[in-house]
């Protein structure tokens, strides 16, 4: 998937406004930055593009160095968000509060995992159906927004929730079953890979 799309407002078949709307309303492409270029400098034209979700709107004529700087800023912002989401899953000390995420796709993703959290059979295929995507599309989307696979996201979500349950006073076996692990021993092994501590050691901090 591209990180950024640059489009002229005036195009055959589909104008830039319609293209932006299609990109921003699709779960697969909603994270892609869109920059619209146009000779229309009127406030109404700019607002039409921004209302459809365009990340920037540049009127012609423009300086190439200004366009480059705007693109650089958008790509830097995307990378910052990607790093942030990646850290939420992979850093043991990162605060895990998916319900406050501003990204609709990620909120829906986390809610889907939580709904089946204690189901050992819940996996990527089921999660993909929950968010209305194919398995391949889900992996592509997660690679773009968090540089992670769907399998990794499910596993890390379960482990982060397990840590919360342990902090609430549940024992190791209870926490394991609550997040879909049928074997507390296997759960402890996977838990240690993320937190560098067994669940028992984690509760004794």
Short names for language-model regions:
Residues 1-6:
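Active-site beta3 strand of CheY-like receiver
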Residues 144-182, 204-205:
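Terminal helix-turn-helix DNA-binding modules in bacterial transcription factors
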Residues 11, 34:
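Receiver (REC) domain active-site loop signature in two-component systems and cognate sites
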Residues 124-153, 177-198:
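Basic/polar phosphate-binding segments, predominantly the helix-turn-helix DNA-binding elements
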Residues 62-71, 75, 83:
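C-terminal output helix
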């Amino acid at each position: 998937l591209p990180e950024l799309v640059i489009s002229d407002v005036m195009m055959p078949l589909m104008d830039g406004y319609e293209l932006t709307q299609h990109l921003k309303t699709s779960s697969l492409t909603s994270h892609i930055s869109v920059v619209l270029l146009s000779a229309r400098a009127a406030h109404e034209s700019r607002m039409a593009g921004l209302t459809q979700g365009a990340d920037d709107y540049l009127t012609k004529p423009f300086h190439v160095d200004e366009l480059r700087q705007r693109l650089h800023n958008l790509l830097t912002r995307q990378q910052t968000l990607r790093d942030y989401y990646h850290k939420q899953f992979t850093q043991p000390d990162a605060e895990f509060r998916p319900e406050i995420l501003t990204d609709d796709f990620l909120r829906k993703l986390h809610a889907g995992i939580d709904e089946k959290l204690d189901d050992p059979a819940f996996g990527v295929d089921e999660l993909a159906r929950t968010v209305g995507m194919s398995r391949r599309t889900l992996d592509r989307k997660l690679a773009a927004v968090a540089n992670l696979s769907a399998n990794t996201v499910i596993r890390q979500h379960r482990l982060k929730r397990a840590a919360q349950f342990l902090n609430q006073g549940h024992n190791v076996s209870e926490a394991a079953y609550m997040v879909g692990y049928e074997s507390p021993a296997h759960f402890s092994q996977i838990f240690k890979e993320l937190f560098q501590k067994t669940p028992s050691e984690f509760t004794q901090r």
